[in-house]
Amino acid sequence: MNNITNAQNPFFGQYQTPHATVPFDRIKTEHYEPAILEGIKQQNAEIDAIILNPEKANFNNTIEAFEESGELLDRVVSVFGNMLSAETNDDLQELAQKIMPLLSEHSNNITLNEKLFARVKEVYDQKETLQLTQEQSQLLENAYNSFVRHGANLEGEAREEYRKLTTELSKLTLDFSENNLKETNSYQMLLTKKESLAGLPEIIVEAAAETAKSEGKEGWAFTLHAPSYVPFMTYADNRDLRHRLYMAYNTKCTHDNEFNNIDIVKKIANTRMKIAQLLGYKDYAEYTLKRRMAENSRAVYKLLNQLLEAYTPTAEAEYKDVQELARLEQGNDFIIMPWDWSYYSNKLKDKKFNINEEMLRPYFELEQVKKGVFGLAEKLYGITFRKNTEIPVYHKEVEAYEVFDKDGQFLAILYTDFHPRLGKRAGAWMTSYKEQWIDKKTGENSRPHISVVMNFTKPTENKPALLTFNEVETFLHEFGHSLHGMFANSTYKSLSGTNVYWDFVELPSQIMENFAIEKDFLNTFARHYQTGEVLPDELIQRLVDASNFNVAYACLRQISFGLLDMAWYTRNVPFEGDVKVYEQEAWKKAQILPVVKETCMSTQFSHIFAGGYSAGYYSYKWAEVLDADAFSLFKQKGIFNQDVA
């Protein structure tokens, strides 16, 4: 591995690609480790230079110099981390087990470096007299707080304990993610009788047949990936099969196998609690919320409980309506279980509004939706998108676009990655391969490279990729995040784009979701993939009318996730109990459907155990409150109004 020369390793030197994009076509697994080790070495040398600078510590020679350090390491780690989520394999995951502790150790070596912190503190203590710009003040504030929040004020045994705990945590979160992906990929429900498929739309049956065929099997294979799981739960008439698939999904990482996350959940929660207490906080939520708009757990609980009170009566009425419909079909003793909810909700929606996802799907062909979403950005901001096949990508399904601003200046690179794969984790997210910053020496505005990653319905042999309305909303959501990243315009990369308070970060994404039911927007792209017919006004009106169908139940579900998150991270004593029982107690006031004791959300709740949302899941609802206010201006002034945008 270490025989690779710098010249052979694509991470070294300048990328010879359009806009210096990542040369994915040249990167192999063996390139990561030597580049990361060299990146650590280079940043250590840069930090030594800051410490050994004979000049008195000032903003330029300490704060800015630290901000600019670690360029090679950042470059490699951004690719490595993103590949672990979007295009991983056994070799990469094995390497991650070796690399992640090294990165944790390196991070600790920086924040626990007493001489470096002394210089940072020296500048911070003079902040009132330095006449800094607003950006410079923010950078200084962030740098100082980051050191303090990562153990710089700890001494002796406490410092060593902090090192130990943070290294353990990096391994635990990695294991959690890997187990989740492997457990998801390991399950398949193979059906061999045609009658088992009753109720399922043709496109779903075709996709299941292709999944089975790709593995040399006869029949129809259904998986735990959203484009397979969600339609099955919504349309399959066979209740026993819905039950089977539901249980497979909702007991992920709880089984007696190597993918079990029960102990890992306990360890992550306990380790975060210990880190927070070591740093002087009563619990992990208090530690996290100190740097959020919400500021403390009282404000979070106030929001969650207010919303809980507001949603519950309507959600209970929604449940009653669905239950009544089910009893008309199944008899008065029938009790709706969680594996029945989507099925009967969909039937009721169809009955009330004469609309369902499959009715809309032919109008949402992926290429057309993409044109519509890109066109919306063009109308609002004047930006344009140009596909560039010369830009290397990490998988044949990924596309790369150059994005230009209204003056025709290069703005950003946008990668799009739409469909599920074995090496891709579940969900949808926006990420970056390169942040934006302004080069101090040349004045050049170095533009960002952004990616949106989804798990949308795949094309089949007979049909293009036809999205559900829910997938269209998801596209708009993640595209909102990408706009936030692409419009970044800061001097410093650590302040640019989505590097904002976490409970603000969901605002741009949720504003974009609002466009999904706007007739003027839908008319720009929604065409039947076979006939070219525009989405009829009558269908749009039904879509608008149905947009609040069972919305209270859906909101209550989000509240339940927020309550579960806070239950794990407001603990101030270690947890040694039963994870499933604790979970059921934590969110019981937000549950309307009967509890299924064997199920567990925590073991697969990547947002709070492996992502950035620990003690932060409430931020979706926080941003919704802000977003309702913000979008009302578009409604008032016109949805394509550039002045509002």
Annotate each PLM feature:
Residues 4-31, 38, 214, 219-221, ...:
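C-terminal, non-catalytic "cap/extension" segments appended to globular domains
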Residues 3-200, 206, 634:
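N-terminal helix-rich structural modules
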